[in-house]
Swiss-Prot record:
Keyword field contains Cell inner membrane: no
GO molecular function terms listed in the Swiss-Prot or TrEMBL record: ATP binding; ATP hydrolysis activity
SUPFAM superfamilies: P-loop containing nucleoside triphosphate hydrolases
A Pfam family annotated for this UniProt entry: ABC_tran
Sorted UniProt keywords: ATP-binding, Nucleotide-binding, Transport
Family named by the database record: Belongs to the ABC transporter superfamily.
InterPro entries on file: AAA+_ATPase, ABC_transporter-like_ATP-bd, ABC_transporter-like_CS, ABC_Transporter_VariousFunc, P-loop_NTPase
CDD domains: ABC_DR_subfamily_A
Binding-site list for ATP: G87, P88, N89, G90, A91, G92, K93, T94
Protein name: Uncharacterized ABC transporter ATP-binding protein sll0415
Length: 354
């Protein structure tokens, strides 16, 4: 029994215990008082904030070679925000997450998490974390595993049972399966659901998710999106890495793009992609001179015209008969996040992952 407990404890040292999540004892009770009419509420500090934070690894036989995994980087994530960190493999996304969680130390710069310096033990009681590659003890059931994680957070037995049941419902894990089936028999997608449940069992204020969609089928991805949106409705802050840009575009309030350890851009989707200004129009028929009065950047491929239109859509549709043209398609001109992401990498000559 001692040997098994030691195994469980050491297996999760990187993803959970190494981050110090279970240090610091019980939570203190917070008593809120109403704000007087003449008083102004305090300004809400950013949940996550970094100032020129960086990470350099030393390699080689004599440890005399340096690899700059993360160049000086400054970001801020606000209360209740869903923040997506994007980048190709080797961009430094997981490195940044581990620095924020206190799993590894930064080489330079500083940062805060929930208003406290990175690494504060009491703060880690208020944080949830799903690693990209979580290590599970094969011979435990999901219920036993979640019960163990809850006990590390010093959650009482009855409350643990209630939360485990709620987490299984939330992530779509059948109660019978959770109690009877050992984790070694789970598929990758099912293990990801268990990992999501353990990240939320302590009812965290901020949740860090490293590739939460990894290994999930379309239904599983939909369920994870719904979980993230429900957490957002509860006022929780979500910080996650993902390669699935379509999901990021649906979920995130703000994003940042990393490549080779460098921050390329950050901001809201409207700031990064631009507002919906105009339409990309495809027409068939008509004359160039007449169409040019309506469409900018007009070009022709075979007998089809492509151009950019700004103005009232109905006005263009009404003018088509007089132009002797037929509308083939009309789409908002704003690029997709995937198009923007690829363009940012190509502009910097980045064609492969590092």
């Amino acid at each position: 029994m001692r040997f098994r407990c030691y195994l469980i404890f050491s297996i999760f040292s990187d993803s959970l215990l190494g981050a110090g999540f279970f240090q610091g004892g019980k939570r203190a009770m917070v008593v809120s008082t109403p704000i007087a009419a003449e008083e102004k509420p305090p300004i809400q500090a950013n949940v996550v904030e970094t100032w020129e934070i960086s990470k350099i690894y030393r390699t080689g036989f004599w440890m005399n070679q340096k690899v700059e995994s993360l160049k000086p980087l400054s970001i801020a994530v606000q209360q209740g925000e869903t923040f997506g960190l994007l980048g190709p493999n080797g961009a430094g996304k997981t490195t940044l997450l581990k620095i924020l969680l206190g799993v590894i130390r930064a080489s330079g710069g500083r940062g805060t998490l929930l208003g406290k310096p990175i690494g504060d033990r009491q703060t880690k009681q208020r944080v949830g974390y799903l690693p990209e590659n979580a290590y599970f003890y094969d011979f435990l059931t999901a219920w036993e595993f979640l019960d163990y994680i809850g006990s590390l957070f010093q959650i009482g037995k009855q409350e643990r049972q209630r939360r485990i049941l709620a987490m299984c419902d939330l992530v779509g894990l059948a109660q019978k399966t959770a109690k009877k089936k050992q984790l070694r028999q789970y598929s990758k997608g099912m293990l990801q659901r268990v990992g999501m449940a353990q990240a939320l069992i302590n009812d965290p204020e901020v949740v860090f998710l490293d590739e939460p969609m990894s290994g999930l089928d379309p239904l599983g991805r939909y369920q994870v999106r719904e979980i993230i949106l429900s957490l957002k409705e509860q006022g929780k802050t979500i910080f996650f890495n993902s390669h699935i840009l379509a999901d990021v575009e649906q979920i995130c309030d703000r994003i940042a793009i990393l490549a080779r350890g460098e921050l390329l851009c950050s901001g809201s989707l409207a700031e990064v992609l631009g507002n919906d200004e105009g339409y990309e129009v495809v027409l068939k028929g008509g004359e160039e001179e007449a169409l040019g009065k309506y469409l900018a950047n007009l070009s022709q491929e075979q007998d089809v015209w492509h151009g950019h239109y700004q103005g009232d859509v109905q006005a263009l549709v009404d003018a088509l008969p007089s132009l002797n043209a037929r509308l083939i398609s009309m789409n908002l001109a704003r690029p997709s996040l995937e198009d923007y992401f690829i363009r940012q990498l190509r502009e910097r000559g980045i064609t492969t992952s590092q």
